[in-house]
């Protein structure tokens, strides 16, 4: 099946579309990436999203407008991907949408909201669309995240038991297919969770203190020019989220601009470079602490944070003897991974197969994820699959 996965992360800077041919061979999911296209949000739409996410207030009218405009933007990127990557032959589109809010009370996720009305995608492309992929997991008591864990477990099964997948987006998340070791009863079940901010607080600081002229630390230049402040870092590390047990999830409903400004009270004399260096060190430390707790021997990293050499250098230092490997070395380009993961989730849904792993999200059971919006071409043709795949093989074109 030829599938397009659509993704925009918590940095809400661009929409990524990855296309792939996906099939099942025995107990193996065979994935052949076809490429990726990416389209930045317009300045107006990005500003509108930023103005609506917590802790800002918004209106039902603004949410309706955003749902439509994000859906139209996703539809345009999907149509481009279908034309440029698939020659117009895509059979299914799987859209994550744009996360606006993750409703968490204590350790329990009570709801999640992704905007980007799928009807616009179906109308523009003629393809059936799988969307709203997180809500079913939440309804079964799960965190609704990290959903990429299903991809990671399939992908890394068969490597060393200490392999851990790490994604550095706005939020950092890890997946340990081996569950961090073995138990007295045998192999441990997979686990996954959000470790905390990756780029979220760095981006917030850069945007705030450059009056919006910059959105992120380009090339890690600010972080490299500064020195982490030991006292501020200790203060940031006192955040209770970091000591919560897994599975757990978080987002910009916690790690946002106002959170950052409150944390910086008493540190007004610090330069922007020192602030960014400290926030970069925070990401490296919290990720490394989480990885070490999983008894990892290898970290396979992907996501936008890999483009920040300062962050990557700090992370290497924090990891010590634990190997840090780019996902590119395993056949999955870092930029494409999340969109590919959602293509796989859409494929699983279309075949009636679970896309969540209960031990990774904390759900009562695994679930078939998402909702279907049929396209004008009708539902995709489905080949009967006797059982869910256990591993994944990446094949080149």
From Swiss-Prot:
Its EC number is 2.7.1.170. GO terms for biological process: 1,6-anhydro-N-acetyl-beta-muramic acid catabolic process; amino sugar metabolic process; peptidoglycan turnover. InterPro entries: Anhydro_N_Ac-Mur_kinase, ATPase_NBD. It catalyses: 1,6-anhydro-N-acetyl-beta-muramate + ATP + H2O = N-acetyl-D-muramate 6-phosphate + ADP + H(+). It is an enzyme of class 2 (transferase). Pfam families: AnmK (PF03702). Pathway: Amino-sugar metabolism; 1,6-anhydro-N-acetylmuramate degradation; Cell wall biogenesis; peptidoglycan recycling. Keywords: ATP-binding, Carbohydrate metabolism, Kinase, Nucleotide-binding, Transferase. One of its GO terms (molecular function) is ATP binding. ATP binds at residues 9-16. Catalyzes the specific phosphorylation of 1,6-anhydro-N-acetylmuramic acid (anhMurNAc) with the simultaneous cleavage of the 1,6-anhydro ring, generating MurNAc-6-P. Is required for the utilization of anhMurNAc either imported from the medium or derived from its own cell wall murein, and thus plays a role in cell wall recycling. Belongs to the anhydro-N-acetylmuramic acid kinase family. HAMAP family: AnhMurNAc_kinase (MF_01270). This is Anhydro-N-acetylmuramic acid kinase. It comes from Rhodococcus erythropolis (strain PR4 / NBRC 100887). The gene is anmK.
């Amino acid at each position: 099946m030829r599938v397009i996965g659509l993704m925009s992360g918590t940095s809400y800077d661009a929409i990524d579309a990855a296309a792939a041919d996906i099939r099942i061979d025995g107990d193996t999911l065979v994935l052949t990436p076809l490429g990726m296209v990416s389209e930045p949000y317009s300045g107006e739409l990005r500003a509108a999203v930023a103005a609506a996410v917590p802790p800002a207030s918004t209106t039902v009218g603004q949410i309706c407008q955003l749902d439509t405009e994000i859906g139209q933007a996703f539809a345009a990127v999907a149509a481009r991907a279908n034309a440029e990557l698939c020659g117009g032959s895509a059979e299914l589109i799987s859209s994550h949408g744009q996360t606006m809010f993750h409703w968490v009370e204590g350790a329990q996720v009570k709801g999640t909201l992704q905007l980007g009305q799928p009807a616009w995608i179906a109308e523009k492309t003629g393809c059936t669309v799988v969307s709203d992929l997180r809500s079913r997991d939440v309804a079964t008591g799960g965190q609704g995240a990290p959903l990429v864990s299903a991809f990671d477990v399939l992908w890394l099964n068969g490597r060393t038991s200490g392999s851990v997948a790490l994604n550095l987006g706005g939020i950092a998340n890890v997946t340990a297919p081996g569950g961090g070791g073995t138990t007295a009863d045998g192999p441990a079940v997979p686990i996954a969770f959000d470790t905390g901010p990756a780029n979220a607080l760095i981006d917030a600081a850069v945007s705030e203190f450059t009056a919006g002229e910059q959105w992120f630390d380009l090339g890690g230049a600010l972080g490299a020019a500064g020195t982490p402040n030991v006292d501020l870092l200790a203060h940031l590390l006192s955040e209770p989220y970091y000591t919560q047990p897994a599975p757990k999830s978080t987002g910009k409903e916690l790690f946002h601009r106002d959170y950052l400004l409150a944390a910086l009270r008493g540190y007004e004399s610090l330069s922007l470079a020192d602030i960014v260096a400290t926030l970069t060190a925070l990401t490296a430390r919290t990720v490394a602490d989480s990885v070490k707790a999983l008894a990892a021997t290898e970290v396979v990293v992907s996501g936008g944070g890999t483009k920040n050499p300062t962050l990557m250098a700090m992370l290497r230092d924090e990891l010590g003897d634990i190997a840090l490997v780019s996902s590119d070395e395993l056949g999955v380009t870092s930029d494409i991974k999340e969109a590919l993961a959602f293509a796989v989730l859409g494929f699983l849904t279309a075949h009636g197969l679970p896309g969540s792993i209960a031990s990774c999200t904390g759900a009562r059971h695994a679930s078939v994820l998402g909702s279907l919006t049929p396209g004008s071409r009708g539902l995709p043709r489905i080949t009967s699959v006797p059982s869910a795949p256990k591993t994944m093989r990446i094949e080149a074109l």
